[in-house]
A protein has these predicted regions:
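Short, glycine/charged-enriched secondary-structure capping and boundary segments
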Residues: 18-20, 59-62, 83-87, 110-112, ...
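Active-site metal-binding loops of divalent metal-dependent hydrolases
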Residues: 8-9, 43, 50, 74, ...
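Cap/insert and terminal regions of metallo-dependent hydrolase folds
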Residues: 164-248
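Conserved beta-strand hairpin/beta-sheet module of binuclear metal-dependent hydrolase folds
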Residues: 1-59, 144-160, 178
Length: 249
């Protein structure tokens, strides 16, 4: 499974407008982050935020190969790129994998003739070429999910926004090959997001083989320091991805 991290930031890109903290003034290109999004096997998009056009206009991406897009929840940083996704020349009609409760909230964003909307209930896999895609509930909004992608015996879970997992999700993810999870804050707790400190504990609890922190906010650390932090506190299986990173699972 080929995973390309197109974007890795939280709801607002880094650097934040008008901000002069150590992340937002960093000269390290890895600290320049756009909204979290990934491309799997060049055919499946995970989330469709407002940076989608920018991501798909990269020179090493052929947008006409994209056939599917899966949505975690209704917030703008995960859905506002639908306008651009429906206007890719010479492409097949995009199939959007979405939970009915999420679709109900954002259906006015869709132009139904431009998409094939595949509404799916949790834990009901949809076949996307050589991939199986299913949604597992997470605690964020009342219609938020993580995206489980499986290719043969390899499993990826994409969960950019959550405070915690319901028990059934935790059980389903035991021993996951790679989990990409919320890193909005380092230690500052909020009602809708886990901290990186909590994520290190969760990754260890799941016995995940690889943990990549995404949805990175500016109340964390610069890339190099954050990479050092998660490895010292969690181990070598913990990673801080950056925009454009490719991983083979």
């Amino acid at each position: 499974m080929k995973i390309k991290f197109l974007g890795t930031s939280a709801g607002w890109p880094l650097p934040r407008l008008g901000c002069s903290d150590q992340i937002c003034t960093s000269l390290d290109p890895k600290d320049k982050r756009t909204r979290s999004q990934a491309l799997i096997n060049e055919r499946l998009l995970l989330d469709v935020g407002p940076d989608t056009y920018r991501h798909l206009n990269a020179t090493d991406i052929n947008p006409t190969t994209i056939e599917y897009a899966a949505i975690t929840h209704e917030h703008p940083d995960h859905t506002y790129g639908l306008w651009d996704l429906g206007h890719i020349y010479n492409s097949k009609q995009i199939k959007v994998v979405i939970h009915p409760s999420t679709f109900q909230k954002i259906q006015k964003l869709f132009f139904h003739k431009e998409y094939n909307v595949l509404k799916t209930l949790t834990a009901t896999p949809i076949t996307a070429g050589d991939l199986k895609v299913s949604l597992l509930p997470v605690n964020h909004t009342n219609s938020s999910f993580g995206i489980l992608v499986q290719e043969e015996d390899k499993r990826l879970f994409w969960a950019p926004d959550f405070k915690s997992f319901p028990d059934e999700t935790t059980k389903a993810l035991a021993g996951i090959d790679l989990i990409a999870m919320d890193a909005s804050d380092l230690r500052i707790t909020s009602s809708g997001h886990q901290t990186i400190e909590e994520g290190v504990k969760l990754g260890s609890q799941l016995k995940a083989k690889k943990v990549y922190f995404i949805h990175i906010g500016h109340r964390t650390l610069p890339h190099k320091e954050l990479e050092k932090y998660v490895r010292e506190h969690g181990g070598t299986q913990f990673e801080i991805p950056y925009d454009s990173l490719e991983v083979i699972l």
